[in-house]
């Protein structure tokens, strides 16, 4: 292995290059250069353009890789002015330093360009001019030292594009109209060299005209005489800006086809007032200026690298230039040597392919578009792309070379064809003309109602002289009329239009063809344009163009309105959504309760300690109120977490109910059911049931197909068919319907469905019998191939798609916007489920009331007797109060005997308004309220401090304080003479008060037993204070010690 490696190294040393590794001179040349090659630059004068060019040059100088790792150094020429003397001195100063290989300039005017042209030839220094303005005329003979790169469209390239467009249209004799041209003779000579033949007519429009009349007079030589042809078939307008070109084109006479030679962007192209068929061109996808600067620097660097491989000294060390003493530098100067390599350099740059022709013209990739002014499907003028030119190759769109000049005024050179059509929406519509008998839109057509040839000839003759009956005049428009107008413009031909007399497509009846086919065979019409299906039977007797519309047969049915079921109001949401909403409601209520009772700020006994608490029933009430937008009083959570969760639940309910409301109207209008048919092979069609009727249009392609393929079906449907498509649709939508299904071309059925305002029509089943619509012509007609070619071009160019979008772009059923006066009426049947739900709610309320009474009378006493389940605040405040505060129903049997004493009984029976209570009453009321709160909270500890009790005992007694029901102060004692029966009434009242006191004492014992002994003393002192005044009467009952 070591031997093999040594042998390989020896062969490499013996066969490899010498020790120099290149040219023997580079070492000395590099030492003199100092590691860089200089490139002079004459920058623009404008500050922004100057900064932009300097930045682009600085970036471009870093990109190229020169031989021997040399760099590119820029030497900027800065003349104080741009007059010839100052410009020459500035350029000469830039060429004085040694090593300046070439000069890069940005001339802004033609004098600068000429001065650079002469300076480059005098000094034999390569000068590369980057032209940023529009096309200019060439500078005479090519100068090998002055290379020009046009960033804008060069004149030579522009003329090449125009010549290619003229040759594509076979226009040989051309007229030129020149605007603002400094050298008309040079431009004409350049045109002759590019086109191969001189222009037939040249008009100089450089002089300004005072008005349109003078401009028309100067353009008159281009006009076509009356009844004759124009002197030239095409005219080119060159050198005009957009404003001047518009004035000229608005004044051009009829005759030639005009081409706008000024390149314009698409957005700057005008449309109004210009002649139809005008051709224009413009450069698209122009590379940025920085890319052009990069490529021109790259051109110099590549040429220097190639020259340095041959003669490094001559390529990299050019002699300094002395403009004051120009001496010849031998047979080939360094500048001429470098120019030779510049002229033979080509590469792929940032702008695309870059190459040099004629030793002075630098080319980069160009892309032009050719536009034609035509009319869109709506009749408005619009620019349409008809071709594309790239690097010398013109590619025309289908139909792009079909544009022909309009006929001159008064000339009748085009053939006039008689066209028959048939009303079939949306392909052909008809309406009455205006008051003047004219059609503001569409084409004037006749509705003769007959197929007699003599009658048709007489009617069209009367129409020509304006004496045709007004009742027979119609305005025809639609899909096929737009197609016919486009064909008449492009072919070209004139036409006169009429509606077929019998209103039929055509079928063989008794050995004769009817309808459209019959008119073509009889010679009454030269062309039939409508939704004319191509089938084998018709193709045997007439010719068809290539199909312009593809369709099939379809089946249309009508919807049947059915009554909404009881649960229709729940249809807007799926059952799983309803279940999820109510599950989320109860879960949210549970979390609201948990957060509120766990919070130190909640509405609970341990939180805010209010007289009300937030329980689970409160949470449910709140969640249901938010969900159904009820404006009822409900407790709200007080803790921040609960409020946040409550707001989130409100957002959830808002979105759910908004979706429900949005879908409610669409769902509750009633269900629509359709006749289910799978297609033409459905058993309902082949074996129709009693009362099932279906049909088609007489003598149509659909009837011919069914008659040929399904004779039995045709025998059944024959008596139910209709004369026209609209009549068949009317039979389907009548009430009661006369048809259950209608079979016809799917393109026609789809249009009927799209315009159905009631949304009752639908096409069902799979399409069958694929067919196409074509233009019918007599057999061996010379127009068949031409029209077929144009139709194919229209398909590929997108014109057919535009027609389809124009006439089929209808608002689909179910998505239309209703008018202000239109309403969706919903009957009582739509709300039957809601009424049933309300009745169920009333029944549920009755059951809930019975359950409430059962719980209060049966379950509550059992819970009260037990020692568990006594704390219900977190669930229901009412149940908790019933267990811990309210006396049970029927407790009279459990009470002990107790005698009521004092005037308390009399005070509780007062019904009249009472005076203001004294201060002692207020203190006692506050004490009772506090005692009630302690009992409500079920706290075993005494809430009143001992110090407060001592102070209360030590304070002077203000007299007895009586507490009456409803918080009212006691009434004044009666005075005066006794009344009859007053003693008996008082005794009765005393007995009632004694019974109530006995019940209160029993309840007090029960509470003390539940709360424990620690809470005995404070309530006892309070009750003793209340009962002290009542001990005075001798019959007042038991002493207070026996409580």
Swiss-Prot record:
Q: How does the record classify its membrane topology?
A: Multi-pass membrane protein
The positions annotated for binding glycine are 531, 533, 538, 701, 745
The principal location of this protein is: membrane
Region Involved in the trafficking and surface expression of NMDARs: which residues? Answer: 979-1012
Q: Which Pfam families match?
A: Lig_chan, Lig_chan-Glu_bd
Give the Gene Ontology MF terms in alphabetical order.
calcium channel activity; glutamate receptor activity; glycine binding; glycine-gated cation channel activity; ligand-gated monoatomic ion channel activity involved in regulation of presynaptic membrane potential; monoatomic cation channel activity; neurotransmitter receptor activity; transmitter-gated monoatomic ion channel activity involved in regulation of postsynaptic membrane potential
Intramembrane stretch boundaries: 616-627
Q: List the disulfide bonds.
A: 439-475, 445-476
Q: According to the UniProt entry, which residue ranges have a biased composition of type Low complexity?
A: 1024-1035
Q: Please state where this protein is localized.
A: Cell membrane; Postsynaptic cell membrane
Query: Which keywords describe this protein according to UniProt?
Result: Calcium, Cell membrane, Disulfide bond, Glycoprotein, Ion channel, Ion transport, Ligand-gated ion channel, Magnesium, Membrane, Postsynaptic cell membrane, Receptor, Signal, Synapse, Transmembrane, Transmembrane helix, Transport
**Outcome of residue 948 to V?**
Found in a patient with schizophrenia; uncertain significance
Q: Which reactions appear under catalytic activity for this entry? A: Ca(2+)(in) = Ca(2+)(out); Na(+)(in) = Na(+)(out)
Cite the effect that the entry attributes to residue 641 to M.
Found in a patient with autism spectrum disorder; uncertain significance
Q: What is the effect of changing residue 336 to C?
A: Found in a patient with schizophrenia; uncertain significance
Q: List residues in topological domain: Cytoplasmic.
A: 595-615, 628-641, 849-1043
Q: Does the keyword Phosphoprotein apply?
A: no
Q: Where does D-serine bind?
A: 533, 538, 701-702, 745
**Superkingdom, natural source:** Eukaryota
Q: Is the keyword DNA-binding assigned to this protein? A: no
Q: Where is this region: Disordered?
A: 882-924, 1012-1043
Quaternary structure (record):
Forms heterotetrameric channels that contain at least two GluN1 subunits and at least a combination of one GluN2 and one GluN3 subunits (in vitro). Forms heterotetrameric channels composed of two GluN1/zeta subunits (GRIN1), and two identical GluN3 subunits (GRIN3A or GRIN3B) (in vitro). Does not form functional homomeric channels.
Name the family the entry cites.
Belongs to the glutamate-gated ion channel (TC 1.A.10.1) family. NR3B/GRIN3B subfamily.
Role noted for this protein: Component of a non-conventional N-methyl-D-aspartate (NMDA) receptors (NMDARs) that function as heterotetrameric, ligand-gated cation channels with low calcium permeability and low voltage-dependent block by Mg(2+). Forms glutamatergic receptor complexes with GluN1 and GluN2 subunits which are activated by glycine binding to the GluN1 and GluN3 subunits and L-glutamate binding to GluN2 subunits. Forms excitatory glycinergic receptor complexes with GluN1 alone which are activated by glycine binding to the GluN1 and GluN3 subunits.
User: What is the name of the protein in this document?
Assistant: Glutamate receptor ionotropic, NMDA 3B
What broad taxonomic lineage does this protein's source fall under? Eukaryota, Metazoa, Chordata, Craniata, Vertebrata
**Gene this chain is encoded by:** GRIN3B
């Amino acid at each position: 292995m070591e031997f093999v490696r040594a042998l390989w190294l020896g062969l490499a040393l013996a066969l490899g290059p010498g020790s120099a590794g290149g040219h023997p001179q580079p070492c000395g040349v590099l030492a003199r250069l100092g590691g860089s090659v200089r490139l002079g630059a004459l920058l623009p004068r404008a500050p922004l353009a100057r900064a932009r060019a300097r930045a682009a040059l600085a970036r471009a100088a870093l990109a190229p890789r020169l031989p021997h790792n040399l760099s590119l150094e820029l030497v900027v020429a800065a003349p104080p002015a741009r007059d010839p003397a100052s410009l020459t001195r500035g350029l000469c100063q830039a060429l004085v330093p040694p090593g300046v290989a070439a000069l890069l300039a940005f001339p802004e005017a033609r004098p600068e360009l000429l001065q650079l042209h002469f300076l480059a030839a005098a000094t034999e220094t390569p000068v590369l001019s980057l032209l940023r303005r529009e096309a200019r005329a060439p500078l005479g003979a090519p100068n090998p030292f002055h290379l020009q790169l046009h960033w804008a469209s060069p004149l030579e390239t522009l003329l090449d594009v125009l010549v290619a467009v003229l040759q594509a249209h076979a226009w040989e004799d051309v007229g030129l109209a020149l605007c603002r041209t400094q050298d008309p003779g040079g431009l004409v000579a350049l045109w002759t060299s590019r086109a191969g033949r001189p222009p037939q007519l040249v008009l100089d429009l450089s002089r300004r005209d005072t008005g349109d009349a003078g401009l028309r007079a100067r353009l008159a030589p281009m006009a076509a005489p009356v009844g004759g042809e124009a002197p030239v078939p095409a005219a080119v307008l060159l050198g005009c800006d957009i404003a001047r070109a518009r004035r000229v084109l608005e004044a051009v006479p009829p005759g030639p086809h005009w081409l706008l030679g000024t390149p314009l962007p698409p957005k700057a192209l005008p449309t109004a007032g210009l002649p139809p068929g005008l051709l224009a061109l413009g450069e698209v996808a122009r590379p940025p200026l920085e890319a052009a600067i990069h490529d021109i620097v790259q051109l110099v660097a590549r040429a220097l690298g190639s020259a340095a491989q041959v003669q490094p000294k001559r390529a990299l060390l050019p002699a300094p230039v002395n403009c004051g003493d120009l001496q010849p530098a031998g047979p080939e100067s360094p500048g001429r040597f470098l120019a030779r390599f510049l002229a033979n350099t080509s590469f792929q740059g940032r702008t695309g392919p870059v190459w040099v022709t004629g030793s002075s013209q630098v080319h980069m990739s160009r892309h032009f578009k050719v536009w034609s002014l035509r009319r869109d499907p709506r009749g408005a003028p619009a620019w349409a792309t008809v071709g594309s030119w790239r690097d010398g190759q013109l590619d025309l769109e289908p139909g792009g070379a079909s544009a022909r000049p309009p006929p001159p005024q008064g000339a009748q050179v085009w053939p006039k064809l008689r066209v028959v059509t048939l009303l079939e929406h949306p392909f052909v519509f008809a309406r009455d003309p205006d008051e003047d008998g004219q059609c503001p839109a569409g084409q004037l057509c006749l509705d003769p109602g007959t197929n007699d040839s003599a009658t048709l000839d007489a009617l069209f003759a009367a129409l020509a002289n304006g004496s045709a009956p007004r009742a027979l005049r119609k305005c025809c428009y639609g899909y096929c009329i737009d197609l016919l107008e486009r064909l008449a413009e492009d072919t070209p031909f004139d036409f006169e239009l009429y509606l077929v007399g019998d209103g039929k497509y055509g079928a063989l009846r008794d050995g004769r063809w009817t309808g459209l086919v019959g008119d073509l065979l009889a010679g009454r019409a030269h062309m039939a344009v409508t939704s004319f299906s191509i089938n084998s039977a018709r193709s045997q007797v007439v010719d068809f163009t290539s199909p312009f519309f593809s369709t099939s047969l379809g089946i249309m049915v009508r919807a049947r309105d059915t009554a909404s079921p009881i649960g229709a109001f729940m249809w807007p949401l799926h059952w799983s959504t309803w279940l999820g909403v109510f599950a989320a409601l109860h879960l949210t209520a549970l979390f609201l309760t948990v957060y509120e009772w766990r919070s130190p700020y909640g509405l609970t006994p341990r939180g805010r300690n209010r007289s009300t608490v937030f329980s689970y029933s409160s949470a449910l009430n709140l969640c249901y109120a938010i969900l159904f937008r009820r404006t009822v009083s409900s407790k709200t959570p007080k803790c921040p977490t609960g409020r946040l969760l409550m707001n989130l639940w409100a957002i959830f309910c808002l979105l759910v109910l908004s979706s429900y409301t949005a879908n409610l109207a669409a769902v509750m209008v009633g269900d629509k059911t359709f006749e289910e048919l799978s297609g033409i092979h459905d058993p309902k069609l082949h074996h129709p049931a009693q009362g099932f009727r279906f049909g088609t249009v007489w003598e149509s392609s659909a009837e011919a197909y069914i008659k040929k393929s399904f004779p039995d079906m045709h025998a059944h449907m024959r008596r139910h068919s209709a004369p026209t498509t609209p009549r068949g649709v009317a039979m389907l939508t009548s009430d009661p319907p006369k048809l259950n299904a209608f079979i016809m071309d799917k393109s026609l059925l789809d249009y009927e469905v799209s315009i159905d305002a009631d949304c009752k029509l639908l096409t069902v089943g799979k399409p069958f019998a694929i067919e196409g619509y074509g233009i019918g012509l007599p057999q061996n007609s010379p127009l068949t191939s031409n029209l077929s070619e144009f139709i194919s071009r229209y398909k590929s160019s997108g014109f057919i798609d535009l027609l389809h979008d124009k006439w089929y772009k209808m608002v689909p059923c179910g998505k239309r916007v209703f008018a202000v006066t239109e309403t969706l009426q919903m009957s009582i049947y739509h709300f039957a489920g809601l009424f049933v739900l309300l009745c169920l709610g009333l029944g549920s309320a009755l059951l809930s009331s019975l359950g409430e009474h059962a719980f209060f009378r049966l379950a509550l006493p059992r819970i009260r007797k037990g020692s568990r389940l006594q704390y219900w605040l977190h669930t229901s405040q009412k149940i908790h109060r019933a267990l811990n505060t309210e006396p049970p129903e029927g407790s009279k049997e459990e009470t002990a005997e107790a005698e009521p004493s004092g005037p308390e009984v009399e005070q509780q029976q007062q019904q009249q308004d009472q005076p203001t209570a004294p201060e002692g009453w207020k203190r006692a009321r506050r004490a009772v309220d506090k005692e009630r709160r302690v009992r409500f909270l079920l706290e075993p500890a005494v809430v009143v401090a001992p110090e407060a009790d001592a102070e209360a005992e030590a304070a002077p007694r203000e007299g007895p304080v009586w507490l009456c029901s409803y918080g009212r102060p006691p009434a004044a004692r009666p005075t005066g003479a006794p009344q009859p029966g007053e003693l008996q009434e008082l005794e009765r009242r005393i007995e009632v008060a004694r019974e109530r006191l006995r019940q209160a004492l029993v309840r007090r014992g029960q509470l003390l037993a539940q709360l424990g002994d620690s809470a005995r003393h404070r309530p006892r002192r309070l009750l003793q204070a209340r009962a002290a005044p009542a001990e005075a009467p001798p019959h007042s009952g038991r002493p207070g010690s026996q409580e």
